[in-house]
């Protein structure tokens, strides 16, 4: 899912940059001759963790536009663009949210919704999706993305990411402390402060733990996808269009689909890789929709 990948990647980058800057400014100071100040570290981790997640959320829309080259439709130049605008407007009214920006970008069949607030979101679809699906199926995809916005998934995920970030920042520094103590235990000139071992370990652990923690975010995302599918069915008055859209996408390239298809839940990754998948298997999604009939 493109919006999830962008959010997580941006979040990891923001946290890494914040850590480096704060360390250079001397704010990252929890170690003294008395040892590691855990309460102070926890407060610091909470502030950095949630600040990083919030910054990632606030810049999610411009980042998505930039990374995909999405062109926001301000004045429809074709009947397809006019239909897209009209469809999103109708779906948004049914969902009770303000009209999102609508964008189109070149690429494989894909779609995403992003934005910091329900009433200032962005819904984007690829040219590949428009070319490979019927209008009924495209409308189902649009309904799915509008449901994400109406459900407040980006904001909710920010809270989840903030909690995850807190643990990542906290644990990275605890590990850094013990590694640094081990490296400097024979240094008679050590004054109990932070050494190079601490700095390097924290930076490495932060990236590694951040990637590992994305498993939690992915698990959360998979559960939100079922809600978005159900939301699309409610907006359209029937689960059939969404089922058709998923089936269509599943048949575009059986068993071997490009990474870009992740946003529509087609990348049914086996084994260990499934832990990092932001979407449940397409068969499970269709089965869940079928149970609504």
UniProtKB/Swiss-Prot annotation:
GO terms for cellular component: plasma membrane. One of its GO terms (biological process) is proteolysis. The active site is at residue 145. Zn(2+) binds at residues 144, 148, 225. It is found in: Cell inner membrane. One of its GO terms (molecular function) is metalloendopeptidase activity. It is a multi-pass membrane protein. Belongs to the peptidase M48B family. This is Protease HtpX homolog. It comes from Herminiimonas arsenicoxydans.
């Amino acid at each position: 899912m493109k919006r999830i990948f962008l959010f997580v990647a941006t979040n990891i980058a923001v946290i890494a940059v914040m850590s480096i800057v704060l360390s250079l400014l001397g704010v990252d100071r929890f170690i003294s001759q008395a040892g590691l100040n855990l309460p102070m570290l926890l407060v610091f981790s909470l502030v950095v963790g949630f600040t990083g997640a919030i910054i990632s959320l606030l810049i999610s829309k411009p980042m998505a536009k930039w990374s995909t080259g999405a062109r926001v439709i301000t004045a429809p130049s074709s009947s397809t663009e006019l239909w897209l605008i009209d469809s999103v407007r109708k779906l948004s009214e049914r969902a009770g949210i303000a009209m999102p920006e609508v964008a189109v970008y070149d690429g494989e069949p894909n779609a995403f919704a992003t934005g910091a607030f329900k009433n200032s979101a962005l819904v984007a679809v690829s040219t590949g999706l428009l070319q490979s699906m019927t209008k009924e199926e495209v409308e189902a995809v649009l309904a799915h993305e509008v449901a994400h916005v109406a459900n407040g998934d980006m904001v909710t995920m920010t809270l989840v990411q903030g909690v995850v970030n807190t643990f990542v920042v906290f644990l990275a520094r605890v590990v850094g402390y013990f590694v640094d103590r081990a490296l400097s235990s024979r240094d008679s000139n050590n004054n109990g402060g932070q050494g190079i071992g601490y700095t390097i370990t924290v930076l490495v652990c932060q990236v590694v733990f951040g990637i590992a923690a994305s498993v939690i975010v992915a698990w959360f995302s998979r559960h939100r996808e079922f809600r978005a599918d159900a939301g699309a069915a409610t907006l359209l008055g029937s689960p059939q269009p969404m089922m058709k859209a998923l089936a269509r996408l599943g048949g575009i390239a059986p068993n071997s689909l490009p990474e870009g298809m992740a946003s529509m839940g087609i990348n049914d990754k086996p084994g260990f890789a499934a832990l990092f998948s932001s979407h449940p298997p397409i068969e499970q999604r269709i089965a869940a929709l079928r149970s609504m009939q």
